[in-house]
Each structure stands twice: as C-alpha cells, then as structure tokens.
Regions:
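Intrinsically disordered or highly flexible coil/loop and linker segments, enriched in small
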Residues: 43, 142-151, 206, 230
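Assembly/oligomerization interface modules of large self-assembling protein complexes
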Residues: 28-113
Length: 325
C-alpha cells in the first residue's frame, strides 16, 4: 500500500477522513515522485515513443544535419584532389510552453478519496488513490499532446490545445516538396496506402513507416477482409492486424501503423521515424508537476508545466497522402 494510503489506514473512509490527512499525504507523495510524473506526462502520447527525442528544448533548438556526397578520384594519378562535398544545414524545433492547472473543492476531493477507499476495501479497485488520481491526469494530457504532435498549428493567442506549437502536418504542408504530396481518390484504402508506398524513394524504403489514423487502419482491414481477391492476405495477417493496430503491408517489408494523432485527418504519412524529432525540456526546473492545498482558496490545486515541439529533419523524404471524397 502506498504512503498516502498508509496515512489514512485505519480511518473509517466515510466518517473519519479529514482534509488535514490529504493536505500532507498526497502532496508529499507527488513531490517525491515529481520527476517521474513530469516525464510520464510529456511521454504519455503514443507518437513520442516512435520518434527521436531531443532534450534541453527550453527555447528554439537547432537540429544539425550533414549531407555528404562522395566522388571517386583516379587512383592512378598523382596529387591530392578533394572528392568529398559536405553541406551542413539546420532544422529548428520551436517548442510551445504548456501548463495544465486544476483545482478541486476540498469537500468534493475528500468525497472522491473516500469513495475510492471504499472501492479498494471491496476489492473492486487495486490502485492506491494517488496513483489512480495522477495516472488519469497523465493519460488525458497524453491524449491531447498526441493530437498536438500531429495536428498542432501555433497561434499567437492560443484558444485550443492545438494552438501551442506547429505539429507535423503543418510542417509537412509547408516543407514537403510538391512532388511528394499525393491526392488519394476513391474509397479503397488498400489501394490508397499502396499508392503512398509506391511513391517512397527506393533508397528509403527499408527505413520508412506508413502512419495512418485509426479509422483509416480499420478501413484497410475491411478492404482486405471483404475483398475476395485479398481475403487470403487478411487470413495470413490476422494476428498482426489485431494486436497493436500495425501490420506489414502485404508483399512488402514496410510497416503500416495507426496513431491517434492522425485520427479524422484523412492523411497517410510515409516517413522515417528516426528523422522525426520530438523536443522536450527534460533538464531544467521549468518542468513542473506540483500538487498542494491552498489555504487562501480552501482548495486542492495542481500544476503541470512543460515545453514540447516537433520537427522533421528531412522533409524531402516524406510522402504525404491526402484522402479526398
């Protein structure tokens, strides 16, 4: 049993639970675990586990790129002539500065704690209150951050959760070459994904992953399952299709993976995941996961603060498909 739950062990959860108990136990637990909690918050989004991580992003940070071209020289000749051309370039991660503030009336908070303890006593809830309480907050931060990673569009005055930094689709729209942008017509998702696959340069095919929204992935499975000419593919790939919403595109070595951030966007994205960067702080005291009781307001309060941003190292490698009706 956890420290905060230990603190109220033996107290009748209905009659004896007091504000003073929670004022000390829960903030202490969160303070002790603050580093792990802020890390969990910024990496809860699904796509953060797929891409390269850049830490120390407290302001704009450059990703340094090196392009090398080697030309053979004539070894039978005397002399020394440079046959290597190298170009150094940069792409910049421009992070957004995000905070999540929450407050609870002390009576409502105590009622929630008491109800949770009753459920634990009855065996229907196993997690200690503080873990259950915090994990639910982290889960929802992750869900919103996942959408922002793909769909974000920075605004001078943010009004929604997508307004704090430019997401991957905004960057792709601006920087991916026109030749790599494909309009996908019809209603056959299998054919649409194959069209994107066919546009991937041959020298990049082994490292590229095709990302889709979950509804597009389900349509892919439908188009394999209910099409008589493809039903054998669905049978052979059945185990893959039902695990992590990812599968190898039949007849290829290329992974197709569903990510929540592309839901309802009608986009199919082929890219090299290691060339997509997710930037976070991770090193300074600007990152915060704090919980306390405000005596002045007579409220429990919480603050989570962090920076986050994304960038594509090489937009020319990306294939961006847009599904049209």
């Amino acid at each position: 049993m956890s420290k905060a739950t230990d603190a109220i062990k033996g107290i009748n959860p209905i009659d004896g639970l007091t504000k003073a108990t929670l004022k000390e136990a829960l903030p202490n637990w969160i303070e002790t675990n603050a580093s792990e909690l802020i890390t969990a918050s910024v990496f809860e989004a699904m796509s953060t586990k797929l891409f390269s991580i850049q830490t120390g992003v407290t302001s704009e940070v450059a990703i340094n790129l090196l392009d090398t071209a080697v030309k053979f020289g004539d070894g039978a000749e005397c002399g020394f002539n440079n046959t290597v051309d190298q170009v150094i370039s940069q792409r910049t991660i421009k992070p957004g500065y995000i905070k999540v503030n929450a407050e609870w009336c002390d009576k409502e908070f105590l009622d929630t704690f008491a109800h949770h303890l009753v459920k634990m006593a009855a065996g229907s809830e196993e997690l200690p209150f503080e873990q259950w309480f915090v994990e639910d907050i982290i889960k929802h931060i992750g869900e919103e951050l996942e959408k922002a990673i793909w769909q974000g569009e920075k605004k001078a005055t943010p009004a929604t959760n997508l307004d704090y930094f430019d997401g991957l689709l905004k960057i792709m729209d601006a920087d991916v070459p026109a030749a790599n942008k494909i309009t996908l017509t019809g209603n056959d998702t299998f054919e649409q994904i194959w069209t994107v696959y066919s546009a991937i340069p041959s020298n990049l095919i082994n490292d590229t992953v095709i990302y889709v929204g979950r509804e597009t992935y389900r349509n892919l499975i439908k188009d394999m399952t209910f099409n008589q000419s493809r039903i054998a593919l669905a049978y052979n790939y059945n185990e893959q299709m039902n695990k992590e919403m990812e599968m190898i595109l039949p007849g290829t070595n290329t992974m197709v993976k569903a990510v929540n951030g592309l839901d309802d966007t009608k986009k199919i994205v082929a890219c090299i995941p290691s060339h997509i960067f997710y930037g976070v702080d991770g090193v300074s005291d600007k990152e915060t996961f704090k919980f306390w009781f405000s005596d002045d307001a007579d409220q429990f309060r919480m603050k989570v603060a962090f920076s986050a941003g994304v960038q594509i190292a090489r937009p020319e490698e990306v294939v961006l498909g847009t599904i049209t009706e």
